[in-house]
């Protein structure tokens, strides 16, 4: 994408010798314009063809506009030439020109390829012309990641949309077809434009979405491709996918592009993409391209710093356009950014169409089709070119093959295949090229500048090139031959390109991570906040960034400095937004990528441009992979040097491309580079200082981007000083890993692999910081295992290596960092750099968190250094430090092997090897299966997740989740862990910051404990760390923003995103006992991601491997809530109490999970650490203040968690303790966590049992009960566990993870997993995998939403959720099994649904994400209602959770009611009570609606599957039946929607928040009142109603009304005592039918109300009167009046009223308000005209004789209440009926309240 094409670095890049060539192509620096050009897709090729760097630059500026035209193939070449030229900065000399012919040829094909790639990768990564084209394709992967984000995610479309979007949409043409079409539409609808506007957000959210979708790109890009073109099943390619994983971003975007154009699978998405329809647009894009490129480039530069756009642009256009376009396009892209975004989407679509046409056409269709259609086959061909190109074929093939599974895991097997073929050849070739990389490094050194340019761009080029090459191979042999010739010419560049591919892969991971972490969570928040606003970090930062990012090429240093600060903020946001360095690298890197270009130019100018060029992550990653990879591959012997070089490079790279995302990271990385890199030898002190300074540096480094600049200069210069080329390359390589680790850190050379692992580790290590301890053992294995888990695994591997390596690296960071320092500081540097990156990514919202993390790292380095270094030095240190590689291998054999094997088998390693590493021996087989399964399941999930992401602009978190998770189930799990790691790391960064700064030194062991859990968590939930970094960043952001919604959204998104992978994970789990355990745990981790509550749920799953819960639970919880403490305490408790068992289970689980080696080790480690962990967690929780604050903020914002907590504490002091622990975990953590471990264990077991139960029926239930009882050891724990279990059972299937898991999970880290682990793993694993996959997906969505909320407010999870559980415990204590049985039934039914929900969940996600769209929401709501009805029916049997429901009523009447129609129905109330805060938060966040909807939808998967439409129909029909009551109900419903809803929401929110129980009751009671005062409420309740509306509206008006009716019903029932309320709610569940009707009514009512808005006041009055009369004379008349009145009264009452009106009009025309009451009287008595008359006369006389005349003035006064009053009267009876129903329990006071409220409202209205 042109956006990132800027690599201000091109100028500095030009400084590089090879960049001298690039020098001509200073435009290359501007190349980031290319994205626009590449938007055309062909322009890259054409530009490649035109290739005159000068002309390219000249054209580059126009090309942005021409880019779309070049997209036409003719201009395409021209556009690409400038873009490609710059992109070709590195490759252009070596392969740029050579590639030019191929690029030309490719251009013809490449319109789709480049179009796709440009659209997808935007070709910025296409370091060379062909690379532009091919790399565009590969950048397609990278960009596509962005693009996929664009397509899949709103951001992607947006980010890609930015100027680069032209190119990207060009790619989008291919990929957007898949992703853009969904993503574009989704993007646009979902908020693509918002993201688009903030291209950074565009890129970032896209990246997040694309990171989610393309970090998942391996999975999510795959998902997009899989989603868009699931047909790209060539799962066989899955192996390649890992290479593609790198590419997956580059390739995946490609794949979607070609897939869309060529691949039918992709094409189907393409049609939705309407890329073809917009095909003409490419010309427009050509015209617009320039502006788009400029505007988009500005945006994209900022954004692509943020996302692939920047990366693409940076890679292709940045080099090309960076110089020129950077200035021109920076300016122009900035202005057209939005245009390109919107226009670009259109143009991109057109380009896409055109490209797809071209792709469809013999050429493009063939290449892309080959990529997409022949994905499986062509990858080989693709590789063939790559083989030719990069002698990397064997390894590319191998790596591609291995990556394919990994990527395939990314779900994008087909995509991976095509991409792997295309990009995997590049990625695999690149990875395999690691050996080739050494050649490449030689080439890279030759091409050093070129390679740097190409390295950064070549990796991009690699993705594109492989894509291009494969495409020619595929589509057109001549093109293939051209590509081959191009490869031959570009042979050097190609290897570099492969490196780039490497970056592409990292991008994938980065994007996925970013998505997962930032896109979903922080991206939604930050990215939405920041990026949505043009990427706050990006647009504001982009301004600065535009200084450095946009102007990065133009103003490399200066912009970088502001960019640094900006990047810092933006990186924080990008990190927050893309908590995973990927997004950081992508979002931040987009910013920083140009910056790194600027920064790196001094050292690695080429790869600065390259970094910027490649993709944020792709470029960075590619550069890292190419340059670092090469160097690393070359330098592996000198592990230290390697690490050092790699690390210096990572510093530069990080500084370079991270320079963008984390200028701070660049600084950090550079500082790390400089302090680590050099400190490895020269800067052990600096490394430590960096650690010490990391925080200053992290924070300051960002701010000190000048330092970063200096560091860029110094670091890069130092890198140059060190090994200018080698070190430069390697550092960048490692940085890529740092990013890659974030992303997919797959471009690890043998030694760099360790480095990459280190950096990868870093990414996890971010999260793994806390994880490091646990990770030192498990993460190594897990790391390996995760790495074994397909593309995501690569990233997971990076993360696992970050966890395992951070086991080695994290400890290296802690102990290992010092160790690496001693080992060479390279690891430390890399780790630190990665940490910086990771930290940055992880701490999207926590720049200070990053800084704190730096401090934490420092502390870990220095403080935990000893503790961490000791355990981790040998085990972790080695993986981290290349010198430690052998040791690491010994200790972290899998991790190190991964790392070591990575160079050759990096891709393969990721799949098999990492599987082996991860699973030990079984891992490889198991992991691949999960990978495959995940791919399959993930494909849909990813697709859906992508949809989510796409639709999720508001809820970008989901994007992250979906994208992230689907990447591959193991990967997803790992990703989840990674997400959790980053999120937790983000929170934990703050926590770690606080705690680790405080506790690290205080509790180095504790720190390590945190790390250990983190590591362990990281193992299963690796991606979670990254993801959750974002999530936590979101909490941070939320805290900062006070956007509970965002945080919850983030969590939701994470949860959602993670959820889909969860299902793949579950599938994977099923496939592999160990694998599935890991998958489940990963799913659990994903669940953790889903919410910190989900985290608890994840702990449930993760607890299966007790290690996991400890790491995930302890770690995740710690960051999010006291949960970490919980987990720590749990782990300590578990370690001590359940120590043997948890250890066994955990070991089993861990081993099953495939931390086998690490799990056992980790188990002991964790076990030993948990004791520290409690301390650390305590401290952490104390330091969790920040997260706790966030949590508290969540709680406060989401729901009056304090009130809830008070009640919750009362109800379940232990649970509240848990929540309190989170609040003040310091005191309780040790005690409560230990109790809770059992509790949670029991609950988790119970829940797991419940989850299993569907499979194992009552077996698990009893076991679960027994275990829960066992877990109940703590009395309250038991209650809670039971309650949780009940809640779990009740909400087991949909809210299984939603609420119960979080609360239980919080408790069950210790208890449940122990006993339930093995069988739960078995039964639960399989069934849960299925149901967990589908339901998890659903529950993920739901639980994201539900748990995301709690996640946002973990206390809500622990407090609110526990609170609900606590009450259910009271209620269900005796009936936990009942609840469980019902939950079980529900679970079974729901799980039965959920498998379908798997497919449905994506839709649900779509719906959820398009919560804006009432249809999906309505469908969702209808299905939810349907299911809610079923659930309500079921609920009676599960009514034991009455208390839960009461709690729900207390906690979340709003959500409750909004969710009541959903999963709330079964245990909705109980769980949703818990979720109520979530829902409240949810309403706060639009995600909440989505959360609510998907959650419910998931709950009502069945209904939703058949129900959404059926329910809609039912609702439609119901509406008619409700019509009679609809006059009444309509008003009420309208009131509910407008006023009642709002009132309910307000009441629910306020009351639920203030007094959950009474509030719920009040809210429930009030809903009728609200309806009565619909007019009054109409305006007033909007805020609460908005909450409600968030969930309701998201459910659609129908859903709203179903909820409203439920509310009414519930409200009517709810008003009854809490206990009665739940019972009534049971009855209310039947109201779901009414709810459906009410929904319809609500819609009709809304219309009518809008029509009779004036009447509504009177209606309100009438209702008030009715209520008044009801209150005064509550007689059956009300019911009769209600019934008769509905029919009779409408006619009879009208005449009496008219008569009365005439009479009373004279009597008191002025007394309209009083008449309201009399009217109400007549309304109820109205069944009898005479009686009505008498009563009306009477009442008007009594209340206000003149009010009845109001009926006559009815016609007179437009507002005359009495026409509506008649209707209102009629309506009132309905309300009255509702009131009576509801008020029977508490009629008078509620009625009075309602009456008064309505009166006041009416008076106000009057």
Swiss-Prot record:
It holds the Pfam family Tankyrase_bdg_C. The modification Phosphothreonine is found at residues 378, 600, 1059, 1163, 1179, 1185, 1226. Residues 1649-1666 have a biased composition (Basic residues). Residues 38-131, 158-282, 299-320, 355-431, 456-604, 627-696, 860-901, 969-989, 1000-1019, 1134-1178, 1216-1265, 1291-1493, 1512-1627, 1642-1806 are annotated as: Disordered. Keywords: Phosphoprotein. GO terms for cellular component: cilium; intercellular bridge; microtubule cytoskeleton. This is Uncharacterized protein KIAA1671. It comes from Homo sapiens (Human).
């Amino acid at each position: 994408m042109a956006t990132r094409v800027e690599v201000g670095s091109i100028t500095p890049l030009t400084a590089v010798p090879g960049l001298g060539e690039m020098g001509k192509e200073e435009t290359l620096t501007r190349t980031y314009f290319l994205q626009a050009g590449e938007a055309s897709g062909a322009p890259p090729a054409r530009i490649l063809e035109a290739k005159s760097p000068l002309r390219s630059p000249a054209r580059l500026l126009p090309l942005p506009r021409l880019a779309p035209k070049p997209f036409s193939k003719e201009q395409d070449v021209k556009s690409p030439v400038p873009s490609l030229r710059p992109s070709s900065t590195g490759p252009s000399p070596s392969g740029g020109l050579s590639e030019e012919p191929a690029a030309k040829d490719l251009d013809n094909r490449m319109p789709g390829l480049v179009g796709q790639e440009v659209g997808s990768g935007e070709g910025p990564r296409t370091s060379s012309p062909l690379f532009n084209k091919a790399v565009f394709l590969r950048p397609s992967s990278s960009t596509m990641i962005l693009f996929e984000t664009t397509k899949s995610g709103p951001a992607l479309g947006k980010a890609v949309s930015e100027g680069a979007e032209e190119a990207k949409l060009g790619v989008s043409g291919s990929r957007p077809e898949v992703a853009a079409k969904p993503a574009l539409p989704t993007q646009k609808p979902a908020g693509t434009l918002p993201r688009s506007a903030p291209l950074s957000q565009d890129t970032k959210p896209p990246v997040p979405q694309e990171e989610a979708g393309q970090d998942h790109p391996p999975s999510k890009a795959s998902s997009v491709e899989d989603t868009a073109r699931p047909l790209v099943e060539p799962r066989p390619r899955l192996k390649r996918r890992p290479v593609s994983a790198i590419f997956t971003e580059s390739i995946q975007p490609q794949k979607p592009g070609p897939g869309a154009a060529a691949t039918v699978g992709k094409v189907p998405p393409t049609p939705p993409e309407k890329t073809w329809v917009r095909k003409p647009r490419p010309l427009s894009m050509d015209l617009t391209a320039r502006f788009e490129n400029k505007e988009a480039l500005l945006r994209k530069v900022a954004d692509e710093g943020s996302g692939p756009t920047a990366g693409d642009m940076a890679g292709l256009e940045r080099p090309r356009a960076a110089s020129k376009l950077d200035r021109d396009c920076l300016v122009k892209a900035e202005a057209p950014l939005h245009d390109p975004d919107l226009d670009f989407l259109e143009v991109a679509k057109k380009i896409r169409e055109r490209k797809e046409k071209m792709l469809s056409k013999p050429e493009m269709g063939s290449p892309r089709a080959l990529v997409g259609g022949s994905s499986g086959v062509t990858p080989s061909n693709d590789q063939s070119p790559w083989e030719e190109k990069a002698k990397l074929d064997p390894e590319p093939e191998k790596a591609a093959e291995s990556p394919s599974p990994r990527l395939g895991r990314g779900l994008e097997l087909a995509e991976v295949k095509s991409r792997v073929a295309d990009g995997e050849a590049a990625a695999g070739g690149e990875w395999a090229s690691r050996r080739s990389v050494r050649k490449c490094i030689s080439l890279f050194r030759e091409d050093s500048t070129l390679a740097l340019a190409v390295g950064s761009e070549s990796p991009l080029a690699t993705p594109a090139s492989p894509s291009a090459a494969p495409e020619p191979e595929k589509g057109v042999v001549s093109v293939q031959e051209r590509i081959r010739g191009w490869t031959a010419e570009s042979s050097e560049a190609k290897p570099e390109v492969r490196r780039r591919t490497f970056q592409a892969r990292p991008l994938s991971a980065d994007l996925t991570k970013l998505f997962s972490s930032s896109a979903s969570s922080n991206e939604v928040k930050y990215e939405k906040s920041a990026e949505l606003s043009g990427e706050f970090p990006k647009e504001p930062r982009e301004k600065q960034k535009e200084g450095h990012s946009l102007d990065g090429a133009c103003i490399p240093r200066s912009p970088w400095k502001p960019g640094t600060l900006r990047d810092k903020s933006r990186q924080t946001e990008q990190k927050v937004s893309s908590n995973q360095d990927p997004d950081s690298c992508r979002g931040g890197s987009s910013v920083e990528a140009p910056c790194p270009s600027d920064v790196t130019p001094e050292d690695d100018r080429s790869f600065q441009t390259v970094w910027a060029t490649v993709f944020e992550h792709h470029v960075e990653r590619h550069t890292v992979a190419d340059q670092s990879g090469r160097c690393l591959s070359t330098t592996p012997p000198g592990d230290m040097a390697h690490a050092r070089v790699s690390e210096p490079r990572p510093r530069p790279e990080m500084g370079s491309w991270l320079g963008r995302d984390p200028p701070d990271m660049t600084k950090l990385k550079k500082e790390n580079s400089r302090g680590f890199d050099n400190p490895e030898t020269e800067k052990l002190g600096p490394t430590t200082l960096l650690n010490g300074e990391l925080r200053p540096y992290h924070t300051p480094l960002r701010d000190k981007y000048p330092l970063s600049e200096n560091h860029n200069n110094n670091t890069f210069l130092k890198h140059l000083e060190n090994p200018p080329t080698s070190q430069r390359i390697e550092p960048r390589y490692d940085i890529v890993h740092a990013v890659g680790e974030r992303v997919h850190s797959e471009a690890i050379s043998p030694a760099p692999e360790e480095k990459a692992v280190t950096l990868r580790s870093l990414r996890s290590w971010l999260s793994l910081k806390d994880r490091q301890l646990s990770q030192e053992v498990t993460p190594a294995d897990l790391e390996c295992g995760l790495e074994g888990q397909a593309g995501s695994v690569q990233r997971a591997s990076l993360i696992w290596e970050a966890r395992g390596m951070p086991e080695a690296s994290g400890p290296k960071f802690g102990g290992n960092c010092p160790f690496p320092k001693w080992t060479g500081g390279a690891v430390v540097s890399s780790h630190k750099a990665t940490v910086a990156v990771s930290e940055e990514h992880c701490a999207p919202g926590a720049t200070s968190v990053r800084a704190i993390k730096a401090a934490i790292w420092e502390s870990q380095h220095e403080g935990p250094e000893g503790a961490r270094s000791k355990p981790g030095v040998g085990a972790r240190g080695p993986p981290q430090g290349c010198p430690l590689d052998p040791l690491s291998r010994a200790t972290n054999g899998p991790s190190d092997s991964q790392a070591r094997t990575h160079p050759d088998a990096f891709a393969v390693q990721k799949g098999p090897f990492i599987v082996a590493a991860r699973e030990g021996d079984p891992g490889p087989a198991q992991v691949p299966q999960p990978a495959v399964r995940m791919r399959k399941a993930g494909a849909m999930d990813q697709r859906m997740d992508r949809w989510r992401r796409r639709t999720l602009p508001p809820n970008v978190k989901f994007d992250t989740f979906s994208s992230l998770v689907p990447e591959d189930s193991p990967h997803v799990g790992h990703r989840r862990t990674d997400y959790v790691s980053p999120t937790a790391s983000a929170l934990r960064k703050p926590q770690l910051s606080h705690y680790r700064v405080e506790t690290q030194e205080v509790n180095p062991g504790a720190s390590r404990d945190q790390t250990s859990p983190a590591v362990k968590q990281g193992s299963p939930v690796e991606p979670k760390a990254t993801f959750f970094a974002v999530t936590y960043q979101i909490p941070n952001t939320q805290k900062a923003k006070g956007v509970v919604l965002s945080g919850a959204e983030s969590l939701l998104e994470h949860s959602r995103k993670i959820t889909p992978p969860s299902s793949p994970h579950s599938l994977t789990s099923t496939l592999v006992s160990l694998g599935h355990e890991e998958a489940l745990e990963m799913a659990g981790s994903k669940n953790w991601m889903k919410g910190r509550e989900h985290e608890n749920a994840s702990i449930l799953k993760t607890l299966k491997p007790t290690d996991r819960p400890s790491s995930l639970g302890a770690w995740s919880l710690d960051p999010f809530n006291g949960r970490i403490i919980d987990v720590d305490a749990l782990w300590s408790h578990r370690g001590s109490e359940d120590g043997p068992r948890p250890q066994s289970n955990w070991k089993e689980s861990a081993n099953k999970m495939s931390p086998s080696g690490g799990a056992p080790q980790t188990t002991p480690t964790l076990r030993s650490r948990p004791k520290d962990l409690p301390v650390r967690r305590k401290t952490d929780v104390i330091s969790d203040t920040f997260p706790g604050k966030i949590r508290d903020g969540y709680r406060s914002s989401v729901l009056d968690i304090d009130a809830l907590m008070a009640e919750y504490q009362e109800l379940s002091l232990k649970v509240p303790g848990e929540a309190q622990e989170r609040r003040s975990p310091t005191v309780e953590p040790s005690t409560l966590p230990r109790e809770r471990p059992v509790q949670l264990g029991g609950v988790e077991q119970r829940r797991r049992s419940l989850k299993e139960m569907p499979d194992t029926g009552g077996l698990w239930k009893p076991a679960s009960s027994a275990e829960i009882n066992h877990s109940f050891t703590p009395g309250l724990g038991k209650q809670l566990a039971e309650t949780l279990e009940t809640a779990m059972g009740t909400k087991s299937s949909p809210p299984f993870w939603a609420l119960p898991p979080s609360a239980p999970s919080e408790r069950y880290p210790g208890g449940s997993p122990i006993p339930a682990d093995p069988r739960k793993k078995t039964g639960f694993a399989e069934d849960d995998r299925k149901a967990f996959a589908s339901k998890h997906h659903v529950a993920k969505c739901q639980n994201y939403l539900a748990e995301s909320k709690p996640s946002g407010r973990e206390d809500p999870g622990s407090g609110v959720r526990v609170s609900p559980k606590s009450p259910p415990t009271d209620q269900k204590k005796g009936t936990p099994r009942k609840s469980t049985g019902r939950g079980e039934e529900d679970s079974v039914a729901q799980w039965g649904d959920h498998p379908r929900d798997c497919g449905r969940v994506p839709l649900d996600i779509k719906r959820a994400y398009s919560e804006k769209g009432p249809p999906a929401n309505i469908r969702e709501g209808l299905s939810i209602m349907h299911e809610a009805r079923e659930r309500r029916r079921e609920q009676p049997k599960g009514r034991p959770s009455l208390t839960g429901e009461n709690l729900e009523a207390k906690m979340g009447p709003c959500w409750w009611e909004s969710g009541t129609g959903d999963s709330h129905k079964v245990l909705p109330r109980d769980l949703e009570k818990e979720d109520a805060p979530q829902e409240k938060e949810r309403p706060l966040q639009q995600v909440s609606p989505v959360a609510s909807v998907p959650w419910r939808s998931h709950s009502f998967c069945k209904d939703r599957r058949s129900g959404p439409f059926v329910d809609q129909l039912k609702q439609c029909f119901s509406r008619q039946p409700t019509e009679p009551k609809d006059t009444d109900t309509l008003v009420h419903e309208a009131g509910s929607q407008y006023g009642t809803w709002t009132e309910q929401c307000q009441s629910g929110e306020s009351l639920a928040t203030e007094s959950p129980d009474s509030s719920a009751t009040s809210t429930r009671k009030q809903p009728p009142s609200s309806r009565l005062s619909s007019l009054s409420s109409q305006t007033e309740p909007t805020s609460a109603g908005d909450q409600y509306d968030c969930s309701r509206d998201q459910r659609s008006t129908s859903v709203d009304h179903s909820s409203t009716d439920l509310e009414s019903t519930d409200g009517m029932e709810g008003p009854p005592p809490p206990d009665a309320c739940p019972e009534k709610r049971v009855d209310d569940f039947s109201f779901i039918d009414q709810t459906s009707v009410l929904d319809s009514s609500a819609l009709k009512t809304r219309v009518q109300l809008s029509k009779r808005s004036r009447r509504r006041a009177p209606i309100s009055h009438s209702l008030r009167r009715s209520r008044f009369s009801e209150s005064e004379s509550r007689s059956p008349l009300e019911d009769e009046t209600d019934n008769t009145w509905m029919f009779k009264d409408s006619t009879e009452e009208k005449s009496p009223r008219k008569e009365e009106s005439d009479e009373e009009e004279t009597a008191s025309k002025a007394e309209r308000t009083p008449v309201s009451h009399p009217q109400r009287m007549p309304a109820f008595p109205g069944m009898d005209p005479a009686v009505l008359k008498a009563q009306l006369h009477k009442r008007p006389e009594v209340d206000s004789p003149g009010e009845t005349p109001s009926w006559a003035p009815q016609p007179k006064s437009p507002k005359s209440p009495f026409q509506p009053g008649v209707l209102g009267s009629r309506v009132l009876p309905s309300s009255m009926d509702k009131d009576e129903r509801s008020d029977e329990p508490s009629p008078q006071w509620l009625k009075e309240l309602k009456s008064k409220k309505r009166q006041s409202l009416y008076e106000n209205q009057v």
